[in-house]
Regions:
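Short, small/polar residue-rich loop motifs at catalytic or cofactor-binding pockets
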Residues: 147-150
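Radical SAM/AdoMet-radical enzyme domain recognition
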Residues: 1-86
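Short, acidic, Ser/Thr-enriched surface-loop or helix-capping motifs
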Residues: 157
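Short acidic, glycine/proline-enriched helix-loop-strand junctions
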Residues: 19, 26-38, 50-56, 60, ...
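C-terminal accessory region of radical SAM enzymes
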Residues: 103-136, 167-198
Length: 198
């Protein structure tokens, strides 16, 4: 379904097994979500010839050494990787703190050096945060299309529901459909499609 209907797929995994399983426990609390999803995600990446997908993780205060998670995903064979900082309340134990920022900057520097080294050796990968235009910012097309929620991007829950973005999961006003019925609320897609920064 996803390969047929989606031009780009985002696969949620946080990196190393212990890091992923800490924030992404199984629904019944038993076993490892990492062990369940890793082989499936590898299959998706290969079915797309390592293009038009991202493995996307979140780093938190629990894994400030997130470069290890990025490199773990690369070592597992993924070539399109995005690992981003958590959005959390300051009181959450896993929230990024002000004092974490210098260490996080070091992690980005270490990651950049390792990425250059691997590209030169012929086993590079794309890291989403490094794929930016430092001079011009987002292109006009991206400014017109916005983030792509609801039209270029969908969050699919473990139970198969579609939302325009992971930020909306659980908010029934934004439930767009599911894997069995497809997109049933095209009005939500249209609303997001018509949103831009101009």
């Amino acid at each position: 379904f996803a390969n047929k209907e989606m031009s780009n797929i985002v696969l949620s995994i946080d990196g190393r097994k212990e890091i992923n399983d800490l924030m992404r426990p199984t629904r019944n609390g038993h076993g490892s979500s990492y062990d369940i999803i890793m082989p499936k995600f590898k299959k998706v990446a290969e079915s797309r010839n390592q293009m038009n997908y991202y493995v996307r993780g979140t780093f938190t205060h629990n894994n400030l050494d997130f470069s290890k998670d990025v490199l773990h995903l690369a070592d597992e064979g993924f070539e399109q990787i995005s690992v981003e900082p958590v959005v959390a309340q300051p009181t959450d134990s896993y929230a990024i703190r002000e004092e974490d920022i210098p260490y996080l900057c070091e992690q980005y520097d270490m990651l950049a050096k390792e990425l250059v080294k691997r590209k030169k050796a012929g086993n590079g990968f794309n890291f989403f945060h490094f794929m930016i235009d430092l001079n011009g910012g987002p292109c006009v097309a991206k400014r017109l299309s916005g983030c792509g929620s609801g039209c270029e991007y969908l969050a699919v829950t473990p139970w198969g529901d579609f939302y325009p973005c992971h930020q909306f999961v659980g908010n029934e006003k934004f439930l767009m459909g599911n894997v069995d019925e497809g997109i049933t609320r095209t009005d939500i897609r249209e609303e997001f499609k018509n949103s831009n920064v101009y």
